[in-house]
Amino acid sequence: AQIIVARSAIKTNDEAKAKEAYAKLQKIAKGELAAEALYYDAYFKNKEGKFEPSNVVVQKIAKDYSGYKYFGAKSLIVMAKNFYGLKDSFQATYILESVIENFKEYTDVIEEAQKELDFIKGEEAKRNSSITN
């Protein structure tokens, strides 16, 4: 039942309720549901500016739930956002390009990765054009 609460809260943009439901789910879930709960743990940590703890969760997904490619791919996008938040745009760009190249079967993931990549490249172009000699 917790997964239904969590997913409906995400769909209705009730992130506080979703965060709570996914935290409860994380304690009891196995397999793909555990990967999903961990993804949202990383997602919420990223939104709170907790970039390094978020990356630790993404690494756990990669290590323990590598068979669940969809949440693995989505969590890599969170990792890229974390690296951008940590001022490492090179690493962020590399991860996003890798997601776009390697997860073509997930069109929603590709679109999200491309959108994030375009944003980062746009921000970097602004930053670089403001540098004067």
Where are the regions a protein language model picked out?
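Acidic, polar-rich low-complexity tracts and alpha-helical solenoid repeat scaffolds
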Residues: A1-N133
